[in-house]
Amino acid sequence: MDYVSLLNQVWQKQVNSSQEGTLAPVRPTYAYRPVQGNLQCPIKWRCIYTFAGYTGTATEPTKVLAKQEAARKVCLRLQEYGRLDGFGLRLRYSTAFEHNRYDASKSYFYTQTSSSSHE
């Protein structure tokens, strides 16, 4: 799960737990703006990501990277104030996949079996 998905999960849990007749929490919002980059990447993207009163801003070469980095900053702020308790973030490079291998020709992770050779 990435940072954007984590914040969407937090929002969905808030929506599901809100009482009928009350205002639902505002969903995470984001906006992009092109900014001047450098010689290697002439145009970069600035993303402003807002959720639960916190805002994260990031400038990266792609929109996806900018959105993830901005969402990460919001997650860090929420974590500081204990608002992410009960939620877990597992990234592909975390220790959860320590013994798994990734085959670039496939779009999924697979676990090494006993018949596979050890690398």
Curated annotation (Swiss-Prot):
GO terms (molecular function) for this protein are:
RNA binding; RNA endonuclease activity, producing 5'-phosphomonoesters
Q: Which GO terms describe its cellular component?
A: host cell mitochondrion; host cell nucleolus
Taking every annotated instance into account, which residue ranges of this chain make up the domain DRBM?
3-79
Q: Which InterPro entries match?
A: Dicer_dimerisation_dom (IPR005034)
According to its UniProt entry, the function of this protein is described as: Induces host cell G0/G1 arrest and apoptosis.
Q: How does it assemble?
A: Interacts with host RUNX1 isoform b.
Would you tell me the protein name for this molecule? Non-structural protein 3b
Organism placement in taxonomy:
Viruses, Riboviria, Orthornavirae, Pisuviricota, Pisoniviricetes
